[in-house]
């Protein structure tokens, strides 16, 4: 909802899953760390929505970045995505349904600690 109003590209959970099967995608979870530990999109990295800098993102500005938060009413993912676009990233998306939409679509999830996170 907010992502479209901000002029950002929006991606559905199903489309994200398809994209992840075809090419490398940086999936960025801007929910709380506790939420990330509880349930997340497979391979998603935790990211502080407004406290991140360029070193937290891929060096290649053509990388595909997909941000998500809790649900379609959450503003953290659109704000973080806008920030990435302002840094010069060209392929930036918001999964506006958030993790609740991903889970609601019965897509696979991960939980718990992950090496390197």
Predicted regions and their residues:
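Flexible, polar/low-complexity N-terminal or interdomain linker segments that lie immediately upstream
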Residues: 1-35, 110-117
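Short, glycine/charged-enriched secondary-structure capping and boundary segments
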Residues: 40-44, 80-83, 107-110
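N-terminal-biased segments
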Residues: 29-49
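Short active-site oxyanion
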Residues: 21-27, 42-43, 90-91
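Short loop/helix-cap segments at secondary-structure boundaries that form the rim of catalytic
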Residues: 36-42, 56-59, 102
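Short hydrophobic/aromatic-enriched beta-strand-loop microsegments
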Residues: 44-51, 90-94, 113
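Catalytic cysteine-centered active loop of the rhodanese-like fold, especially the PTP/DSP P-loop
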Residues: 58-103
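Mobile, glycine- and charge-enriched loop segments
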Residues: 18, 25, 49-71, 109-114
């Amino acid at each position: 909802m907010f992502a479209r109003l901000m002029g950002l590209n929006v991606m559905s959970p199903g489309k994200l899953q398809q994209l992840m099967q075809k090419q490398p995608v940086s999936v960025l979870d801007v929910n709380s760390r506790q939420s990330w530990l509880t349930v997340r999109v497979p391979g998603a990295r935790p990211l502080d929505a407004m406290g991140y800098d360029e070193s937290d993102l891929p060096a290649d500005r053509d990388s595909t970045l997909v941000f998500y938060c809790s649900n379609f009413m959450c503003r953290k993912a659109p704000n973080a995505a806008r920030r990435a676009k302002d840094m010069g990233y060209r392929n930036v998306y918001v999964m506006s349904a958030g993790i609740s939409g991903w889970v609601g679509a019965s897509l696979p999830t991960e939980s718990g600690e992950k090496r390197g996170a």
